[in-house]
Amino acid sequence: MISNNVIDELFLIGLPPNTTVGGAVYTRWGRTKCGASSKLLYEGYTAGSWYEHKGGASNYICLPHDPQWGNYQDGFQNSGTKIYGTEYEMGHYSNDPFQRINFGGKNFKDHDAPCAVCYTQGRTSHVMIPAWKTCPAGWTREYHGYLVAQQNSQYRTEFVCLDEAPEVVAGGVANKNGALFYVSEAYCGHSLPCPKYVHGRELTCVVCSK
């Protein structure tokens, strides 16, 4: 039985409270809106662990704009992990294949990255495919872009698909670091078959649902 609170939340994001129709949830990295056929659950700030910290988490997360606090003790106790915002580093150590149509044609290096969490009603599966720009037959393309992660000399993160035309967090330009986004490139000669992969070429990605 679906609760009244959940029904209210579904109405708020424009979804009918129909428990017989499932869906999937994905994160659109670098954007504040979802694709035309998806519903926005929330938008926020891309966040993760400090790029030089060997501990903490290795994944990126999408923090909502308005946190809801539970029990807390202000001030750092040095007993837990810390979460930082995420900066674009394209154009520094890596190439910049991204479109700038959502940022007035300007360079977005050192700007903070937004994110959007999206719901695909009626399409219950989603997948991120690296090195593809299109989806398999029968699948819906939610967005496409380029594969990003932290740089090789930094501590490891997951690979995520950054939208091909990123946006930035307003007022978030400063070289303060935190978690970082660098473009991923194919590296031949160490188990990766080349061709068809090309040494040093930036890798695309696509997020698909069905």
Task: Kindly give the residue locations of the regions a language model identified.
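N-terminal, immediately post-signal peptide pro-regions of secreted/luminal proteins
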Residues: 1-13
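Folded, disulfide-stabilized extracellular/luminal domains of secretory-pathway proteins
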Residues: 21-198, 202-210
